[in-house]
A protein has these predicted regions:
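Hydrophobic topogenic segments
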Residues: 1-167
């Protein structure tokens, strides 16, 4: 809950994005230094955390991605996965399974975003993902982030490129 409050222009961009894509408006928004990509955190009252460097220039497709995580309660799922890992700290299969579930969650969020985007917006979405590929934000416990580690980016970009072509 630390960080600066969202600026009026950022709040307005979030409101317009939620309205455009018929998604719930994110009420709690913080601007934070020292992070590279936006992410959601908090189970009961999720907070959208936006990097200070992106506060005024954040793309609506990035907001769309994070709002889709919010709509589908991905922060709670991510927390439960971390809890499962903590309780099964001795079992490498659980770590592997949780990583697969997190990667699939990101892929599903990408698919949901692509279903709402049209034409050139889909290519731009893939480019945004590439720009965020080297983020370290996604590894924080209890968060969701558009960037989910460089290993998974190649697969996600391939899925974005194939979106709509594969039955």
């Amino acid at each position: 809950r630390k960080g600066a409050a969202a600026t009026p222009s950022l709040r307005e961009k979030i409101r317009k994005t939620a309205e455009k894509y018929d998604l719930p408006t994110q009420k709690s928004v913080r601007i934070c230094k020292g992070i590279e990509t936006p992410f959601l955190c908090g189970m009961v009252r999720p907070i959208l955390v936006v990097p200070e460097s992106m506060a005024e220039t954040i793309d609506e497709k990035v907001l769309l991605h994070e709002m889709l995580h919010l709509k589908h309660h991905d922060v709670l799922v991510n927390f439960l996965l971390h809890l499962l890992q903590a309780l099964n700290w001795f079992n490498p299969f659980v770590y592997w399974l949780c990583r697969i579930i997190r990667n699939d969650s990101e892929a599903l969020c990408d698919q949901r975003a692509l279903e709402r985007l049209h034409g050139e917006e889909k290519r731009e979405y893939g480019m945004l993902l590439l720009d965020m590929a080297d983020s370290r934000c996604a590894s924080r416990i209890g968060t969701t982030s558009m960037a989910n580690g460089a290993r998974n980016i190649k697969t996600r970009i391939g899925r974005i490129a194939d979106f709509g072509r594969v039955p």
